[in-house]
Amino acid sequence: MLIRQCPDLRNLSILTQGLEPLHSIDARSLFSGDHWPRLRSLELGNLRVGSATDDDSDAHPFISFLSIRNHLQTLRFSGDFTLSSTHFARLPRDSLQDLRSFSGSIDHLTSLPSAKSLLSMEIPNPLILREVTPLTITHALQAAPAVRSLKVSFVLQSGYDGIGILRSIATAGAHIKHLDLTFSNKPSFYLVSPLIPELGARLIKFDVLR
């Protein structure tokens, strides 16, 4: 019904809060075909658009669906998203050229061929701060070098020096002006400017929640 009655759909948000991963909604039939050519914003929650064990084929229905959405500007995934990041790497290089805002896993982000055009990036699932986490953030920001707004949350482990993650953001996120960080508990720093001058000097907005 949604496909037939809304042929010019521009914004679609399907969120399924409270559902366990095993009870995710099967939406595969909704995202196969050439409908909604003017779609600009797509937000999906705990949905199944494919299986993580699907064959990594160029012809995956959801990937084919995304590849012809030339006007898509915002793409957001939350909850349990079952499609493997290797599928996103199969997107044609000239697809999603208008995409400017992405929310989802780092693996999905770095697999997007259009990541270089992103201006806003959000990692909704908390990252556990380990020794490799700064490298992970650096890799993500190098894949999306034009990002101006970054939102990410961290789970701090006891004794970890949280300032290292700020140094990584300052180095790799050369254009970031809006930084929104959430920590599971009190981080080991208080002010950005004295500690990371090159980051604090260019930020317009900096929020730390704990």
Model-flagged regions — what are they?
Residues 1-210:
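Leucine-rich repeat
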